[in-house]
Amino acid sequence: MKNPENISGAIRDEMKSIGLWDMHPRNLYRVSWKNEPVSEGGNYGAVNAMVIPKEITGVKANIIGLVGKWFPTGAHKVGATYGCIAPALVTGQFDPSSTKAVWPSTGNYCRGGAYISSLLGCESVAILPEGMSRERFEWLQK
């Protein structure tokens, strides 16, 4: 979300009681690089980024890294998956009453897809390769 400051005050107040990783439709408003860096009840602020010191990079130019930790699920892939499914829903190309969303990946993309699908009320299938960590499978089973 490019301009979270445009979200109504009533919705922002409601979000104060919703955790960043909760399965709650209001967390669709948190698909943003500008989430306040707190796990419970946050609102918005500056872009979540950090300047990597020149002592580490070895170059004179500023190198800035974006921080995905403060997205729902702790991974920025919720943005990528929302960007895939939202246009299909809006244009009618995807009908959640008769179609499942399928999210194949090695981890965060399918996690983001399953999460966003759930918030939108869409049934989904997350596909992980066999050798992935037990934690990823357990998270998806929830």
Which positions does each model-derived feature cover?
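PLP-dependent amino-acid enzyme catalytic core
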Residues: 1-142
